Swiss-Prot record:
TM stretches of this protein: 6-26, 43-63, 98-118, 135-155, 200-220, 253-273, 285-305
Protein name, UniProt field: Serpentine receptor class J-38
Subcellular location: Membrane
Species assigned in the record: Caenorhabditis elegans
Entry keywords, A to Z: Membrane, Transmembrane, Transmembrane helix
Primary location class: membrane
Membrane topology: Multi-pass membrane protein
Family: Belongs to the nematode receptor-like protein srj family.
PANTHER family, per the entry: SERPENTINE RECEPTOR, CLASS J, SERPENTINE RECEPTOR, CLASS J-RELATED
GO cellular component: membrane
Length: 330
């Protein structure tokens, strides 16, 4: 029953919440004055559309993550793509690659905030080129991750034999029947270990390089904003700080609840540490949360959106109270 909640119901609940929250988020953005967000509106729309796509894929391609001794592996448990085939394997790899694409999505947001502060023409006159570059960067991240999964992460017969008893004990099925992405760091042939280490190094390098870029761009933007505060209007400077703060929160959420558990699953098998099954449940569940948690965080971080929610709440409360008052007067 717990497996059904983790792998079937929780992704569907997350998807439903994403399809409620993200349209509201987009409505808030595009009903503000156009000069408030400028072209940044379209990057936020791109972000919301990505969240909707990811939430659907999270339901259609449900994954399970497990580790055993020196091996980490990811399999498909339910849905349309369980039967072993190259196409179904690519669907599993694509599910992982979408998570990697979110690195690119966050990166283009940080670059945009940096360029706005320096009044770059890419944020104004040539914004269509910036959006094109943003799309291409997201595709590049996706393709890079997909390629690594195919050439280095594809579970060999040796790896499947290594985890055969563990899979039979945990899932009641044979390891040869699963579409599997994995790494095997020890107790294996040189080729298997080499591919596993190379895959992990490349995955880690992409992750660390992306997060480092966020930090550098955020620090440079803050430094420039502090200089600008002397010349720019207080309102403009304050709003730019609020947008950057919202972006930092937007970035921290997937890093903490989604990417950090991934790193643990990659690295604990290096030392032969087997994580408890409950941690695997947590990780699978957490990977689906940011598609609706992130927009909520942005809405709550920006005062203009908080005020609109507050005003809506007050108006709704007042309209509900008025009929009851009239009834008492009668």
């Amino acid at each position: 029953m717990l497996d059904d909640w983790i792998y079937i119901f929780l992704p569907r609940i997350s998807c439903a919440l994403a399809w409620v929250v993200n349209p509201i988020f987009v409505y808030f953005i595009f009903t503000e004055k156009s000069q408030t967000f400028g072209n940044y509106r379209y990057l936020l729309l791109f972000f919301a559309l990505f969240n909707l796509l990811y939430s659907v894929v999270n339901v259609v391609v449900p994954i399970d993550i497990h580790n055993y001794r020196y091996c980490f592996f990811l399999i498909l448990r339910h849905g349309w793509f369980v039967e072993i085939s190259d196409f179904h394997y690519h669907m599993a790899a694509g599910r992982c690659s979408l998570v990697a694409s979110s690195y690119a999505l966050l990166l283009v947001h940080f670059i945009y905030r940096f360029l706005v502060i320096y009044d770059s023409s890419l944020t104004r006159l040539h914004f269509h080129w910036y959006m094109t570059g943003s799309l291409l960067l997201s595709v590049a991240y996706f393709v890079a991750w997909q390629t690594i999964c195919w050439f280095l992460g594809y579970a060999s017969v040796e790896m499947r034999q290594y985890v055969r008893e563990e899979i039979r004990r945990t899932y009641g099925r044979d390891s040869m029947d699963f579409n599997m992405i994995g790494t095997l760091y020890d107790e294996a042939s040189y080729e298997a270990k080499f591919k596993s280490w190379l895959a992990t190094i490349i995955w880690s390098s992409i992750s660390v390089a992306s997060i480092s870029a966020y930090m550098v761009l955020a620090l440079l933007t803050i430094h420039k904003l502090k200089k600008m505060s002397c010349n720019a209007s207080k309102k403009t400077s304050k709003f730019q700080f609020e947008l950057l703060r919202a972006l930092i929160v937007q970035t921290l959420i997937p890093i903490v609840i989604s990417f950090s558990p991934c790193l643990l699953c990659w690295y604990t098998p290096i030392f032969g540490i087997q994580l408890p099954r409950e941690f695997n449940y947590f990780e699978v569940g957490a990977l689906g949360l940011f598609s609706f948690v992130d927009p909520i965080a942005i809405i709550l971080c920006l005062p203009i959106f908080r005020h609109r929610i507050s005003n809506f709440w007050k108006t709704s409360t007042t309209s509900l109270e008025e009929p009851s008052t009239k009834v008492r007067n009668i």
